[in-house]
Amino acid sequence: MTMSDPIADMLTRIRNANTAKHDTVDVPASKMKIAIAEILLKEGYIKSFEIEEVGSFKTIHITLKYGKDKNEKVITGLKRISKPGLRVYANSTELPRVLGGLGVAIISTNKGVLTDKAARNANVGGEVLAFIW
């Protein structure tokens, strides 16, 4: 059976692994998911990620990040905004701020997948994929 929302599946896998205090999580790879993982790494929400290829099947191996001990989570919340049944778009002036600027909104634009701050600076809008805080 095919997956109706692979991005929500990725975010759910990360959320579940973070809640269970796992060190790593594996996610089936796609260009969009790799771009989201790059944003998570750049913003400091994950330690690292690498793409592993087994035959023709690629997976993203994500290493999660915690505070001094595993009880301090770096990712406190992940929320999928635009869904297959209800797409959410915003222009550059309407881009949302997550927790007053403390979190990050991931936006899919014509210039690639960007954070809300980068999209505002580039003066582009797009589909609001997810919030991370």
Curated annotation (Swiss-Prot):
Family, as annotated: Belongs to the universal ribosomal protein uS8 family.
Database matches in Pfam families: Ribosomal_S8
Assembly description: Part of the 30S ribosomal subunit. Contacts proteins S5 and S12.
Keywords: Ribonucleoprotein, Ribosomal protein, RNA-binding, rRNA-binding
Record protein name field: Small ribosomal subunit protein uS8
GO molecular function terms attached to this record: rRNA binding; structural constituent of ribosome
Function: One of the primary rRNA binding proteins, it binds directly to 16S rRNA central domain where it helps coordinate assembly of the platform of the 30S subunit.
GO BP field: translation
Cellular component terms per the entry's GO annotation: ribonucleoprotein complex; ribosome
Disulfide cysteine pairs (residue numbers): none
